[in-house]
Amino acid sequence: MSSDWDTNTVIGQRVRTGGSGPRQQVARTQGQINAARRAGLVLSVDKKYASSNTKANNEGQRLTMVDRETDIVKPKKLDPSVGRAIAKGRGDKGMTQKDLATRINEKPTVINDYEAGRAIPNQQILAKMERALGVKLRGKGIGEPLGGPKKK
């Protein structure tokens, strides 16, 4: 899987000594490489190595894998018990959906989606709701009062 971007062709008979003689240069086009080969000047074709600021992007691999799968995978939805726990906790505190949304810096539609069970669960939003309502929304015991910090 080698491309022109990966190779580095150096043109010149020998490394230049002193102030005279032909300079060593890097060929940028295929035409320059061919001209140098005809003249017998190609010294080496070196592979460029990846620089330090590049990293692999796995998102394309994941999308390809999802594309090739034959069965349809539904995204995870919120359990209805979580929506009921949010509504109950909100009612106990006397808050509207808008009040809760402003308290956790989200839009009221997000709160509505979570209560209706339409939302794809986001751990950060659930954690903010847990703290604002004082009710567990994740793990075991959904709807139970949230315990304070652990004693040492």
Swiss-Prot record:
<dbReference type="GO" id="GO:0005634">
    <property type="term" value="C:nucleus"/>
</dbReference>
<comment type="function">
    <text>Transcriptional coactivator that stimulates GCN4-dependent transcriptional activity by bridging the DNA-binding region of GCN4 and TBP (SPT15), thereby recruiting TBP to GCN4-bound promoters. Involved in induction of the ribosome quality control (RQC) pathway; a pathway that degrades nascent peptide chains during problematic translation. Required to prevent stalled ribosomes from frameshifting.</text>
</comment>
<keyword id="KW-0804">Transcription</keyword>
<feature type="domain" description="HTH cro/C1-type">
    <location>
        <begin position="86"/>
        <end position="140"/>
    </location>
</feature>
<keyword id="KW-0805">Transcription regulation</keyword>
<dbReference type="InterPro" id="IPR001387">
    <property type="entry name" value="Cro/C1-type_HTH"/>
</dbReference>
<dbReference type="GO" id="GO:0005737">
    <property type="term" value="C:cytoplasm"/>
</dbReference>
<dbReference type="GO" id="GO:1990145">
    <property type="term" value="P:maintenance of translational fidelity"/>
</dbReference>
<feature type="region of interest" description="Disordered">
    <location>
        <begin position="1"/>
        <end position="32"/>
    </location>
</feature>
<keyword id="KW-0238">DNA-binding</keyword>
<feature type="DNA-binding region" description="H-T-H motif">
    <location>
        <begin position="97"/>
        <end position="116"/>
    </location>
</feature>
<feature type="compositionally biased region" description="Polar residues">
    <location>
        <begin position="22"/>
        <end position="32"/>
    </location>
</feature>
<dbReference type="GO" id="GO:0003677">
    <property type="term" value="F:DNA binding"/>
</dbReference>
<dbReference type="GO" id="GO:0140469">
    <property type="term" value="P:GCN2-mediated signaling"/>
</dbReference>
<dbReference type="InterPro" id="IPR013729">
    <property type="entry name" value="MBF1_N"/>
</dbReference>
<dbReference type="GO" id="GO:0072344">
    <property type="term" value="P:rescue of stalled ribosome"/>
</dbReference>
<dbReference type="Pfam" id="PF01381">
    <property type="entry name" value="HTH_3"/>
</dbReference>
<dbReference type="Pfam" id="PF08523">
    <property type="entry name" value="MBF1"/>
</dbReference>
<keyword id="KW-0010">Activator</keyword>
<protein>
    <recommendedName>
        <fullName>Multiprotein-bridging factor 1</fullName>
    </recommendedName>
</protein>
<comment type="similarity">
    <text>Belongs to the MBF1 family.</text>
</comment>
<dbReference type="GO" id="GO:0043022">
    <property type="term" value="F:ribosome binding"/>
</dbReference>
<feature type="compositionally biased region" description="Polar residues">
    <location>
        <begin position="1"/>
        <end position="11"/>
    </location>
</feature>
<dbReference type="InterPro" id="IPR010982">
    <property type="entry name" value="Lambda_DNA-bd_dom_sf"/>
</dbReference>
